């Protein structure tokens, strides 16, 4: 009888749905100096495992990831896993002096987190000073085993990560800019997977080549890791189908060109031509420019090569490929905001049964922040002049006119230990203290205030945030990245946001869900998110120059009442300041 009962129970257990448990993945990343040559210029740069860009990391939805980061360089270091929610694991998020003190020379730290409810293309990068110029790599999250993509399985998946190459040391560049108050020097080239390509001098051998077969579909995982530039990207004589943005599936649409801001990722399907075309095709990217400062006005190119038919393979195939006609794509104009707007408007969440768009329909708190540039007075002694907008001012940037001052202690630890006094203020304004015509004639006083201010939210608060660009020192697009959350972009527009009219046009059905949004130049973006993740979460412009100038702030989400709504305790190896 007991045996029959046991068999019956066992049979019932077999009938229950079996959970797809994740596994634990271990990685070790050594941050070390490495000599790298590009554009006939060799320099010693900060690398990951001696590679530039860093190695591809792969996990599946549901996996626990333990990444030991060992610092073997003179610089302090921290790594951010861009787009990972870090549910209750804020200690692993990575921004220096926000969620952790940086890892000092000769020290190590294990980033320990579980990937919950996420799959797609993300990336990792250094999150201190300008070290992410060389410390970055793809972070690919595959769906759970047995869970298909919402599109046909591609023949092959290819990460393509855009970056910027500087002949000079980027730490010296931002250090000089900070001292003089001026704009930093721009990059010498853009790169695809670390390679500038043949349109630059002394660079033909450093070209990314994508070898494809006719009649196949390739999933290109595009990542913009550039420091300071949004990019247009196109493949000559080919269209692509956009299927994902910031690791969220979108309603598929075809396009010849994509726009991708720093911090953003975009997955596209490339269907190759049905037969061998007897040609090769440039894949090019160049900047989308809205600001008034200097920029790197150059173009990176990779080459799409078709595998030749079998009868032409052999010793001469590489030579024959070299002799093929090479087509170039036509990219939008550098300042083509019309294209940027149309592309942005096409992005919609898939909003299917399996991948719903859970937009907060009821909002607990509404915030209105300005984002833009400003000035600080010269801090030089001996009446030395600055190189900012005037010879008595330095460039600055702010959110709601508060230029964020980086603390010397980690904010998350200060909050967790109850020792926040003198480290940060919990009083970030809900809206600008001094309203003005944000996109009209700028005010005479362009000075910012400086402080370490946090916005405090009770657990599970539903938030609506409108971010408004300003015309101070010129309107400009700002890609804003929020750590710890995805958000829904429910509205965008140009001019000043109208709280009475504009919300009527909000998309609350299938808005794009992402972690980095471009606030339009001379316009605004409205986002909604649910503050269901306790911790301190950085929000900043992903143009590194603007972040350095202070266009950043942080949200403090308090613990909830239940045990699974509370921040986990700090790990034993958390770095000390």
Swiss-Prot record:
One of its GO terms (molecular function) is oxidoreductase activity. Cu cation 3 binds at residues 127, 483, 540. Keywords: Apoplast, Copper, Glycoprotein, Lignin degradation, Metal-binding, Oxidoreductase, Repeat, Secreted, Signal. GO terms for cellular component: apoplast; plant-type cell wall. Ubiquitous with higher levels in the inflorescence stem. PROSITE patterns: MULTICOPPER_OXIDASE1 (PS00079), MULTICOPPER_OXIDASE2 (PS00080). InterPro entries: Cu-oxidase-like_N, Cu-oxidase_2nd, Cu-oxidase_C, Cu-oxidase_fam, Cu_oxidase_CS, Cu_oxidase_Cu_BS, Cupredoxin, CuRO_1_LCC. It is an enzyme of class 1 (oxidoreductase). Cu cation 2 binds at residues 82, 125, 542. Glycans are attached at residues 35, 76, 112, 185, 201, 237, 297, 335, 383, 391, 401, 437, 444, 450, 460. Its EC number is 1.10.3.2. Its cofactor is Cu cation. SUPFAM superfamilies: Cupredoxins. Residues 1-22 form the signal peptide. Residues 30-146, 156-309, 427-561 form the Plastocyanin-like domain. Its main location: secreted. Disulfide bonds: none annotated. Belongs to the multicopper oxidase family. Lignin degradation and detoxification of lignin-derived products. This is Laccase-17.
């Amino acid at each position: 009888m007991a045996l029959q009962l046991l068999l019956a129970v066992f049979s019932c257990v077999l009938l229950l749905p079996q959970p797809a448990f994740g596994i634990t993945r271990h990685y070790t990343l050594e941050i070390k100096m490495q000599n790298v040559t590009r554009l006939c210029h060799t320099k010693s740069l900060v690398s990951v495992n001696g590679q530039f860009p860093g190695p591809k990391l792969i996990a599946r939805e549901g996996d626990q990831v333990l990444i030991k980061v060992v610092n073997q360089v003179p610089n302090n270091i921290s790594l951010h896993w861009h787009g990972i929610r870090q549910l209750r694991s804020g200690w692993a998020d990575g921004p220096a002096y926000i969620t952790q003190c940086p890892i000092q020379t000769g020290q190590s730290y294990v980033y320990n987190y579980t990937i919950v409810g996420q799959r797609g293309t993300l990336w990792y990068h250094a999150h201190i000073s300008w070290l992410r110029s060389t410390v970055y790599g793809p972070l690919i999250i595959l769906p759970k085993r047995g869970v298909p993509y919402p599109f046909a399985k591609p023949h092959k998946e290819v990460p393509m990560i855009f970056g910027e190459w500087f002949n000079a040391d980027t730490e010296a560049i931002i250090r000089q800019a900070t001292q003089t108050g001026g704009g930093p020097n721009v990059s010498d080239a853009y790169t695809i997977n670390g390679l500038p390509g043949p349109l630059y001098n002394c660079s033909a051998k450093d070209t990314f080549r994508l070898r494809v077969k006719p009649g196949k579909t390739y999933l290109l995982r595009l990542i913009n890791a550039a420091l300071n530039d949004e990019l247009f990207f196109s493949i000559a004589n080919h269209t692509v189908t956009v299927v994902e943005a910031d690791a969220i599936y979108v309603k598929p649409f075809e396009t010849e060109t994509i726009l991708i801001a720093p911090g953003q990722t975009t997955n596209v399907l490339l269907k190759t031509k049905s037969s061998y075309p007897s040609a090769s095709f440039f894949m090019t990217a160049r900047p989308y420019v809205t600001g008034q400062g200097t920029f790197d006005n150059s173009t990176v190119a990779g080459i799409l090569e078709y595998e030749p038919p079998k009868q032409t393979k052999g010793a001469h195939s590489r030579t024959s490929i070299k002799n093929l006609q090479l087509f170039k794509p036509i990219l939008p104009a550098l300042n083509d905001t019309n294209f940027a707007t149309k592309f942005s408007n096409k992005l919609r969440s898939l909003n299917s049964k399996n991948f719903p768009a859970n937009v907060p329909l009821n909002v607990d708190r509404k915030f209105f922040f300005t984002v833009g540039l400003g000035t600080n007075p010269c801090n030089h002694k001996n009446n030395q002049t600055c190189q900012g907008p005037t010879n008595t001012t330095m460039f600055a940037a702010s959110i709601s006119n508060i230029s964020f001052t980086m603390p010397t202690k980690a904010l998350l630890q200060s909050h967790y230990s109850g020792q926040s006094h003198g480290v940060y203020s919990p009083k970030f304004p809900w809206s600008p203290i001094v309203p003005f015509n944000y996109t009209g004639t700028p005010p005479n006083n362009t000075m910012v205030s400086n402080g370490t201010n946090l916005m405090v939210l009770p657990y599970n608060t539903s938030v609506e945030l409108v971010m408004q660009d300003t015309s101070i020192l010129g309107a400009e697009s700002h890609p804003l990245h929020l750590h710890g959350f995805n958000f829904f972009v429910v509205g965008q527009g140009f001019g000043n946001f109208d709280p009475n009219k504009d919300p009527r046009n909000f998309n609350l059905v299938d808005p794009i869900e992402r972690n980095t949004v471009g606030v339009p130049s001379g316009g605004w973006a409205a986002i909604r998110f649910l503050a269901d993740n306790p911790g301190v979460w950085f929000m900043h412009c992903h143009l590194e120059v603007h972040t350095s100038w202070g266009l950043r702030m942080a949200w403090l989400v308090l613990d909830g009442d239940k045990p699974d709504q509370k921040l986990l305790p700090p790990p034993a190896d958390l770095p000390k300041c």
